[in-house]
């Protein structure tokens, strides 16, 4: 087929330009209605300022997102005035989304008025973030009467819900609470009322003792996030449909009654005052994670899997295999005794593993590692028995690579033991010149003769 001539290309461009003028084909009243309804409110306000044609356009926006209203460093009184004006001028019958990031002190009455207007207009998504005030707002919202809401995110805002509400939050799919008091009756009320709940986030909330989730009758509950709730001592989950579990905090007791659906877990364990915890606290929970396909965790998790004395001078690993795991990320935290040996011992129990990420951006190995040198190095580097063969592994990434000799041990391990390896990326921090080690040119050359696809990037 012959390429188009210059004249043909010009005609095509002219035809395209004609099609790109919607105002010539769409009636002006329809265009104005579409803009006033479907443009996010801040885009609509900007259009009204910049365009004379749309200066008198009514406010019917379904999306009232004011999260970026501080971008021009407006004063609080100006921000409140803009929002108040929008609500006073809003002519639409519905508001689907209201996002507010504001210091609430002194304007509580206006916030209550705005939210009540949203409830009257069948709000579907409500996000209230009062973190700017650094003080929890006790907003008197009666959620027992809110039926249309599907997404609710509250930051630094008190949350209450009656235990047996006939309508309240029956359609809610996503609930995210941050920096608020959560009690046992609150959790019970959530799962008694929100029968369509899919996702629950509890971030920096205050709750003592036990977090018990009874979702055995829920068919859609798939995701749970529990982040930094230091007063918790135990988590008990009866959630047969749970697929994704994220926990960030100290090692505590966990009991998951049914794990058939659980596929992904992010277990970012931290230490209490930089002390070591009892290994048994974590070992007792490992059985709940053996069916995972995706796991992200810290070195505290690996420490629980290291060999222990079982009597008569014998050392044994806890008997856990992760036969479905395909993606694994390990973040090194200080202090830790973990080395390549601990990584390799875990990986050999993951026969389907395809991707590995090792994050050492906030960690540096010691200059001398005598235990590794004396007890583990020879075992790891012995390739005659292929104990550490990773047949399915294709992708490896090391975040925070600084050229330390033990980092090269890790790189060499993967290029020698992963016959299907396709990508090996070493991400170096741009500001790590003071931490970077003198390159071991000879060793790097040896590694590249085994696998030439090593890629070094700066991030």
UniProtKB/Swiss-Prot annotation:
Protein name in UniProt: FBD-associated F-box protein At1g61320
Residues annotated as domain FBD: 396-428
Higher taxonomy: Eukaryota, Viridiplantae, Streptophyta, Embryophyta, Tracheophyta
Positions of the UniProt region annotated as Disordered: 1-25
Family annotation (Pfam families): LRR_At1g61320_AtMIF1
PANTHER family per UniProt: OS02G0105600 PROTEIN (PTHR34145), PTHR34145:SF77
Domain of life: Eukaryota
Domain F-box: 21-69
InterPro entries, sorted: At1g61320/At1g61330-like, LRR_At1g61320_AtMIF1, LRR_dom_sf
């Amino acid at each position: 087929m012959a390429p188009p001539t210059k004249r043909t290309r010009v005609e095509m461009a002219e035809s395209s330009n004609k099609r790109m003028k919607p105002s010539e084909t769409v009636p002006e009243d329809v265009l104005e209605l579409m803009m006033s309804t479907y443009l996010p409110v801040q885009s609509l306000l900007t259009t009204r300022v910049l365009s004379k044609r749309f200066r008198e356009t009514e406010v019917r926006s379904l999306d009232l997102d004011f999260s970026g209203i501080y971008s021009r460093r407006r004063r609080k009184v100006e921000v409140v005035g803009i929002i108040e004006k929008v609500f006073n001028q809003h002519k639409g019958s519905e508001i689907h989304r209201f996002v507010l990031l504001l210091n609430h002190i002194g304007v509580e009455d206006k916030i209550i008025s705005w939210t009540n207007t949203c409830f009257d207009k069948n709000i579907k998504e409500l996000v209230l973030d009062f973190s700017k005030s650094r003080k929890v707002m006790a907003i008197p919202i009666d959620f027992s009467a809110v039926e249309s809401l599907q997404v609710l995110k509250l930051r630094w805002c008190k949350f209450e819900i009656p235990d047996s509400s006939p309508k309240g939050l029956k359609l809610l799919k996503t609930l995210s609470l941050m920096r608020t008091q959560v009690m046992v009756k609150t959790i019970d009320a959530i799962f008694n009322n929100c029968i369509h709940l899919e996702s629950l986030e509890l971030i920096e909330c205050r709750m003592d003792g036990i977090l018990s989730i009874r979702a055995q009758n829920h068919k859609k509950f798939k995701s749970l996030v529990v982040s930094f709730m230091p007063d918790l001592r135990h988590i008990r989950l009866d959630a047969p449909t749970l697929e994704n579990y994220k926990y960030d905090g100290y090692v505590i007791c966990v009991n998951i009654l049914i794990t058939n659906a659980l596929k992904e877990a992010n277990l970012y364990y931290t230490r209490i005052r930089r002390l070591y915890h009892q290994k048994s606290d974590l070992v007792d929970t490992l059985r709940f994670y053996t069916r995972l396909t995706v796991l992200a965790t810290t070195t505290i998790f690996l420490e629980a899997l290291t060999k222990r004395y079982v009597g008569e001078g014998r050392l044994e690993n806890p008997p856990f295999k992760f036969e479905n795991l395909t993606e694994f990320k390990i973040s090194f935290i200080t202090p830790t005794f973990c080395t390549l040996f601990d990584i390799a011992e875990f990986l050999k129990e993951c026969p389907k593993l395809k991707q590995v990420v090792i994050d050492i951006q906030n960690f540096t190995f010691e200059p001398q590692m005598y235990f590794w040198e004396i007890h583990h190095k020879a075992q790891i580097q012995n390739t005659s028995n292929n104990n550490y063969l990773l047949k399915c592994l294709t992708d490896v990434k090391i975040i925070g690579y600084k050229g330390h000799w033990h980092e090269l041990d890790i790189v060499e391990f993967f290029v020698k033991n992963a016959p299907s390896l396709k990508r090996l990326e070493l991400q170096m921090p741009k500001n790590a010149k003071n931490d970077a080690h003198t390159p071991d040119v000879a060793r790097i050359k040896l590694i590249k003769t085994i696998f030439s696809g090593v890629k070094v990037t700066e991030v």
